[in-house]
Amino acid sequence: MTQRGRAAKPTGPTGRPRRTGGQRGTDRVGRGGDLATRRARLHQVVEPVVQGAGYDLEDLSVSRAGRRHVVQVIVDADGGVDLDAVADVSRAVSAALDAAEEVGGDIVAGEYQLEVSSPGVARPLTLPRHWRRNTGRLVRFTVRGGPEAVDRQVTGRVVEADDERVVVETDAGRTEWRHAELGPGRVQVEFTRPGEPDAFDGTDEAGDFDDDDVEDEER
């Protein structure tokens, strides 16, 4: 995860006045308009940048952390996202936000921190591409039982996945399901995966930085 931020200062880098605070007890994303409108504008700025860099925008959220907003951008791609890619996307998104605010005013009011990261294993598998990108992993998921049957939990290894179906190998053998039959999947953490002598090598995934690796720029 990379972090960039904008401090609450009287003026920004270009001399444009910035608001240094918001209304107490509110979660405003920007000046004027309602929260939903500002969130939509944020999405319109961020998504083309992420897609233009060759990645999928998996999530975009805004939250409050004390006096500042936190803008969290989660990106992914086939083959995963490495540290350099996360840093590149972070710089590109930060520049796009600055440019958009120069034209149309603040999108995020006052102080904000931009965090860009990869999904990590904790995020649920909800789209066909999520299952495809986790081929070979052990996943726990719900098989929907339909109107007259009971949902059941299944744990198995994803063998194949495309836009229509998922093939999972369990203790009972291989079974194919359509995506419509499945609830969200959860990747199960394995320290040693089949065919690997030791899958835990002590390295961090793209979304996990040590403190020394985090870039925190105050603007």
UniProtKB/Swiss-Prot annotation:
Provide ranges: composition bias, Acidic residues: 198-219
Primary localization class, coarse: cytoplasm
Q: Which family does it belong to?
A: Belongs to the RimP family.
The entry's localization annotation reads: Cytoplasm
Q: What is this protein called?
A: Ribosome maturation factor RimP
Alphabetized, the UniProt keywords read: Cytoplasm, Ribosome biogenesis
Spell out the residue ranges making up region: Disordered: 1-38, 189-219
GO annotation, cellular component aspect: cytosol
Give the protein's function: Required for maturation of 30S ribosomal subunits.
Annotated GO biological processes are: ribosomal small subunit assembly; translation
Q: Which domain of life is it from?
A: Bacteria
Pfam families on file: RimP_N
